[in-house]
Amino acid sequence: MASCSTSGTCGSSCCQPSCCETSCCQPSCCQTSSCGTGCGIGGGIGYGQEGSGGSVSTRIRWCHPDCHVEGTCLPPCYLVSCTPPSCCQLHHAEASCCRPSYCGQSCCRPACCCHCCEPTC
């Protein structure tokens, strides 16, 4: 089963923001119980082959509708108990990357997905 890549971006990991500078899957930094098994919920967005033991539904990135654009604030929320996701807000130059679905499904490429300013999910 795949594990997190330390060369990946913080937004592609399952870890708390403070852990993302060095490694995305330090056990003590995990936001999800399945962090050590390939990132679980939220992990693998943009990679498409994150672990063989999880279903597609466990790898959906749930975005809050009040998120900001990529590159600001903190990494995305990953909790499945969030308010259902809305299509992410985009930089104007990336508008074409948004399709009529949800962030983390078919809506956006990883570079376009929104980031939550506060972990309020």
UniProtKB/Swiss-Prot annotation:
Q: So which tissues is this one expressed in? A: Expressed in the middle/upper portions of the hair cortex, in the region termed the keratogenous zone.
GO cellular component terms attached to this protein's record: cytosol; keratin filament
Query: Keyword set for this entry?
Result: Keratin, Repeat
Asked whether the UniProt record includes Protein transport among its keywords, one would answer no
Top-level taxon in the UniProt lineage:
Eukaryota
Describe its partners and assembly state. Answer: Interacts with hair keratins.
| Function comment | In the hair cortex, hair keratin intermediate filaments are embedded in an interfilamentous matrix, consisting of hair keratin-associated proteins (KRTAP), which are essential for the formation of a rigid and resistant hair shaft through their extensive disulfide bond cross-linking with abundant cysteine residues of hair keratins. The matrix proteins include the high-sulfur and high-glycine-tyrosine keratins.
Family assignment from sequence similarity: Belongs to the KRTAP type 1 family.
Name of the protein in question: Keratin-associated protein 1-4
